[in-house]
Amino acid sequence: MLTAEEKAAVTGFWGKVKVDEVGAEALGRLLVVYPWTQRFFEHFGDLSNADAVMNNPKVKAHGKKVLDSFSNGMKHLDDLKGTFAQLSELHCDKLHVDPENFRLLGNVLVVVLARHHGNEFTPVLQADFQKVVAGVANALAHKYH
């Protein structure tokens, strides 16, 4: 999946990421840009417009939770399927989340990282992160296969 150099680049960069802010924004943007994903979060309260979503404390808290799990995956890049096995089972068997949503969230995460880190998030680093988010999405979709 990733070369040793790519792993070093993404893990080194990840240490600079403000997980709470980036997670909140990434999940919020997912819910705004792809509104059909909101059906999994109806219990979060007001998701009626972009401002409501982006300022919703439950969206922010869950976004941090999502990125905390992603952070754990960053520590286990060689075993993403094992790392995300329980979450894959939960999202497949209990929550019935369309696995395409994992890919969408990964792409939104890359946008948010670029927004937060500007020129430091180089095209090469973006390419490396695209590999990571694809690997995480595949690991989360593993139970579906």
From Swiss-Prot:
Tissue specificity field: Red blood cells.
Record keywords, A-Z: Acetylation, Heme, Iron, Metal-binding, Oxygen transport, Phosphoprotein, S-nitrosylation, Transport
GO annotation (BP), single: hydrogen peroxide catabolic process
Ranges where the Globin domain occurs: 1-145
Sites bearing Phosphothreonine, chain numbering: T11
One Pfam family of this chain: Globin
InterPro entries registered for this protein in UniProt: Globin, Globin-like_sf, Globin/Proto, Hemoglobin_b, Hemoglobin_oxygen_transport
Modified residues (N6-acetyllysine): K58, K81, K143
Domain of life: Eukaryota
In-chain residues carrying the UniProt-annotated modification S-nitrosocysteine: C92
Keyword Membrane attributed: no
Binding residues annotated for heme b, in chain numbering: H62, H91
Example of a GO MF term: peroxidase activity
GO cellular component terms attached to this protein's record: blood microparticle; haptoglobin-hemoglobin complex; hemoglobin complex
Family: Belongs to the globin family.
Entry function: Involved in oxygen transport from the lung to the various peripheral tissues.
Quaternary context: Heterotetramer of two alpha chains and two beta chains.
Protein name (record): Hemoglobin subunit beta
Organism of derivation: Ovis aries (Sheep)
Lineage of producing organism: Eukaryota, Metazoa, Chordata, Craniata, Vertebrata
